């Protein structure tokens, strides 16, 4: 477990990941915890170790884990911002890729995230520098 300055813990492959093998990460609001489900990400992206796939990288797996970390970090930022979104959701909504719209539907139907917070998190999971800047601004 890793703790960072905003009194958050970062954990990996907890029971929550086993309970839902579709998720790559989650944010526990009550316990200030971000959980990254690396085993789920590996399975969903056909991860292969070096013996199974020499000279091939696992770019898709690495990307999925980074996106999950940025997505869940966005929820931490929202919590630091009095449980509100940071950006203008109406402007962000139009930028959602169809695959992210499907993921958004899944997230809002299966988890407690509100539509606006999930839209923001899905948009920002592709914007590492912006997430880093907002973490510093709202949480540190």
Positions of PLM-derived features:
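Structural recognition of the beta-strand scaffold that forms the well-ordered cores
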Residues: 35-36, 76-78, 123
